């Protein structure tokens, strides 16, 4: 109470911060008459003037006022849109590395032009991140008109681009793209073997649109590039044979949380059985070198206790097929990850499909923290303000709306059963549709969307077919004639262009649109219809002229008339029904369930009431909804029965809303803790990832790594001497024979070490020096024999390839370690500290193995066919070996709503994954088709050819060493 009083008197901290931006807004407004008087050429010339000022030492912040004023004028001339004062404030928040919370329809896309232009003046690249390819392309084209008018370059990163196209896009002043594309490009760049092959040029400044979706909702689902792994089917089968011998006393099962763990008795039993089967060969089960076996045991245990045949999965055509728990449908093509699917295959004795190994991964949390400067925009961030501040050091500023919000948010209606809830929803849709009020029905999943669609069909509605060119024509005609169409649309999140079009037309009188809570973000729902979309669809082929101008005016008039109908579509007061006042028209939001996050509910509500429009929202709940079960539906069910509620009746009260919000706050706090915990563990891997990636980049940037190779060889010798000639040990205790074998195996040197140790007074330092001298002489001879230039190339490639191989194995080991480290808590040890300690030891082991394996390979390398002349002009193939190739790679990122790999279906519905020229599975068909169309004798049919692809002429050489070389010379 006192806090509310103080806020009323002094204002909130947010109000004070917004007020602090007002003087600069006034300064920008004061410049407007002067800048409006400039010609287009003079306005464009200001960009170079600003750059000259920066070069002379002017601070970027000092250019904010004139730069923002310049962008506002450019937008007025190019787009016909003028930034409001509150949009200027939003732009300042973004420039200062904050999050601008702006309500739906307040023009976030236009706001971004202000800080993007200002920061692009530095020439270091600005990245604008959107949630899908359609929005990236749309915004780059739409706002790109402003940037290009002012002399800046704009690029777009979308699926299917090759390296050359990506590099061009990243070289632009401003680059638009999706979070997935930016993240995967970073991972792939750090798997390249030449600096010239890398596409990104650094991480200077990024603005993340829908920042809450990307940095909160997707924070726990890492981007993963995976590749085929060695066949482990025998180990899956061997471990599976032990599982049927377990009894309930051997494990603790929590079906509600879907978790299972071995008891102490279970651990002892499993260890004995694994030893008897010859699987556990040495040490205890939970020793670090046995993490792979522990991983297999855990997955086999889950397969046998948590998953039931014909309930969770079925066996069909020698395959384990997952059954969706909500719909009961088979989910062809979906597989459980982390070896669980292979464990189920072993359990059912079907063919075990190969699993993929993680080649590289990163979470969005750690990717976006690479940027020196980060900012974000969204309509809903306040509920997660603490998380943005703690994890990303980003402050959330709530930007005032240009006009007051007129939407009415009604209290929830709570029903006893799901059936009663859905019956009430269909009745409400019927009533609103009869008034021609547009309705947006929000659901928590694609399956629930389909369920609502089926219920509407049973009620006599038909699904709108957007593949029919006349479908929308009929809708517009019905709106003009005040007819009820009884048609509805369902958003399909896999086709973003269609999705945006459906959302854009969801404000037409009588429109019924069913969507998941997340679908369609980024596209406004305008009451009456979307003029730009209709011009594009209906008048796209009509040439400029009086006829087109008249048609546009007719569309404007029709949309204005439709808007008036929508505004008048509200529900009138009905005292008998307990409704004392009129409810507004505008877009009617119907929520079919509460999400566990208040933010997602607010996003759904925020679709209505844009820019001062009226609107209405209401949530329909049942006691069987997930959140209501958490809240305690048994108690509430009893309360409803005592109140005498009959079937089909609902309880509506503000107290219910408050209770649900408290439940949501608890869930949000739990999820925040989980994300923080994930980040703590991921930070351990992230620190190691940064070291490895920096070392790789440093190695690629060197003309020669000979000095590094020599240091590695000397380090290996030091390790050998330390192991076989321990410090302070007597000469009789030295292991001369072991040292001799290691020198022969790794260094390729057959040395009389046993004779050396017999010499009077010889010390370990002397033996070390002799080994170094012998290895240096041997290696120098090898370099001379194979050719210095060839060996310089080979050294770099061997170091990089061995590092990559060991890093991939290290990732798998860390992943397995992370899964079992929680058990240390039972021994009163902190699992996180244990993980840090063991991860550090494993990383030290990686460094030691890197030295030894690089030394061993280079100490035995021989070039089979040495042709120095060919090497000089034909490439490394003529010298007897080929350049390293990237392994087969598959991008993976699980959608936090559906759980699907967003790239698993890319080959069937769009142009593939994030792969471009990388040979991802989703790209294979289209890539092969392109090759088949090339005529070896006609270079004009070749199209863009990758430098490392086989030359289309059929010579067998790489393109860069064949016709690509001629093209370069030309």
Curated annotation (Swiss-Prot):
It is an enzyme of class 7 (translocase). Its cofactor is Zn(2+). It comes from the Bacteria. May bind 1 zinc ion per subunit. Zn(2+) binds at residues 951, 953, 962-963. The keyword NADP does not apply. InterPro entries: Helicase_ATP-bd, P-loop_NTPase, SEC_C_motif, SecA, SecA_CS, SecA_DEAD, SecA_motor_DEAD, SecA_preprotein_X-link_dom. One of its GO terms (molecular function) is ATP binding. The keyword Metal-binding applies. This is Protein translocase subunit SecA. It comes from Methylorubrum extorquens (strain CM4 / NCIMB 13688) (Methylobacterium extorquens).
